A protein has these predicted regions:
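Cytochrome P450
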Residues: 1-396
Length: 396
């Protein structure tokens, strides 16, 4: 029997792309791998192959049992795994809240929150943890307000999301889904009461979903709960990691912050380069081939599982020359950090707004920001769908 390697984790490599993924992309771009939950799959690491899988042609996220893995099927994961028209219909219910125009209208509020959190950081005095004071609370409060949850609940919502994104042989943490699902159910009742008293159906995302369920019958209550949780988790953890790891990237390239202060037009490209180069999602959604497909010459048969690595694809030298280098002037930069095709990240515009706001404000307010500990002593969270810095002590 051929040897099957374990999936390499960026958490074991100081948040950087594991060297094994670089090697596989160059030498064995479609290879067998054992995932953290024990399943084996084809690991796809080249840009064009990853883009092909993400396009959806010949692949599906909707896995039949037992291919879906331990405790990963059923109602909780239904909205994550949908494909085709059902997926587009559910996505359409909330897409208006995430358009570039709608998100741009949130700019003053995101700036206000960022300023307030940096005030708290400065009051704490150096050394202070940028994760605890800024990177964690900002996306949590923003997504809570967008969804229609009390901002004061952001800490416990973050803890639930941390549990539901853990991966391993036990599969999905069903108790976390149940607890969070009960919370969403209670909040949905509050939104229903608001609607009965003349509230606007588009007041927030959860109210929109309650209206679509009650008045239009466009989704089941289980789908309402599941979709709410998926949006919440997606808006919390990935942006938290991108903020903290993005600040670390800038501090690790000391010439770049001064460059960005001198030329603010480079801020947008710098955000895109951080998104390209920094691993944020450890494990992308696993898919299954629905027909025989060749990827980089390797035959993937119908029914076989495929695990893509967007992180490896975003370093592909065929698309990104000198891909390991951090280059804020890189153009073009067609990274896949937000996915591709029908499942392109719904919250991409929101994530970009938060990242641009945080980085620009830090650059102006804390020009002398630096790490308060050696970079090699920083701890990264493993065993989750998303990567994450546990803390980022900084001084100024």
């Amino acid at each position: 029997m051929d040897h099957v390697a374990d999936y390499p984790s960026a958490a074991d490599h100081a948040g950087e792309l594991p060297p094994g993924l670089d090697r596989l992309r160059r030498e064995d771009p479609v290879s067998r791998v054992r995932l953290p939950d024990g399943r084996t799959a084809w690991l796809v690491t080249r840009y064009e192959d990853v883009r092909t899988v993400l396009s959806g042609a010949g692949f599906t996220r909707d896995l039949p049992a037992p291919a879906a893995g331990p405790a990963a099927g059923g109602i909780p994961m239904r909205t994550v795994n949908m494909d085709g028209r059902p997926h587009l219909e559910l996505r359409g219910l909330v897409s208006k809240a995430f358009t570039v125009r709608q998100i741009d209208g949130m700019r003053p509020r995101v700036q206000e929150l960022t300023d307030r959190l940096l005030d708290d950081l400065e009051r704490e005095g150096p050394p202070a943890d940028l994760v605890r004071h800024v990177a964690a609370p900002l996306p949590a409060v923003v997504i809570c307000e967008l969804m229609g949850f009390p901002a004061a609940d952001h800490d416990r919502l973050s803890r639930w999301c941390d549990r539901i994104t853990a991966v391993g042989a036990g599969g999905l943490d069903q108790s976390a889904w149940r607890e969070l699902g009960m919370y969403v159910g209670v909040m949905a009742e509050h939104k229903r009461a608001d609607l009965k008293q003349g509230g606007r159906p588009d007041a927030d995302v959860l109210t929109t979903l309650v209206h679509a369920h009650d008045e239009e019958g466009r989704l089941s209550f289980e789908e309402l709960v599941s979709l709410t949780i998926v949006i919440l988790a997606g808006g919390l953890e990935t942006t938290q990691t991108a903020i903290s790891a993005g600040v670390l990237t800038l501090l690790s390239h000391p010439e770049e912050p001064a460059r960005l202060r001198e030329d603010p037009t480079l801020l947008g490209p710098a955000v895109e380069e951080i998104l390209r180069r920094q691993p944020v999602i450890e494990l992308n959604r696993i898919q299954m081939a629905t027909e025989d497909v060749r990827l980089s010459g390797q035959l993937v048969r119908a029914g076989e599982l495929v695990q893509i690595s967007v992180n490896a694809a975003n370093r592909d030298e065929e698309v990104f020359p000198d891909g390991a280098r951090f280059d804020v002037t890189r153009q073009p930069n067609p990274h896949l950090a937000f996915g591709h095709g029908a499942h392109h990240c719904l919250g991409a515009a929101l994530a970009r707004l938060e990242l641009q706001t945080v980085f620009s404000t830090i650059l102006q307010r804390l020009p002398d920001l630096r790490l308060a500990v050696p970079a090699e002593s920083l701890r990264w969270r493993g065993g989750h769908v998303t990567l994450g810095l546990l803390e980022l002590p900084v001084a100024w």
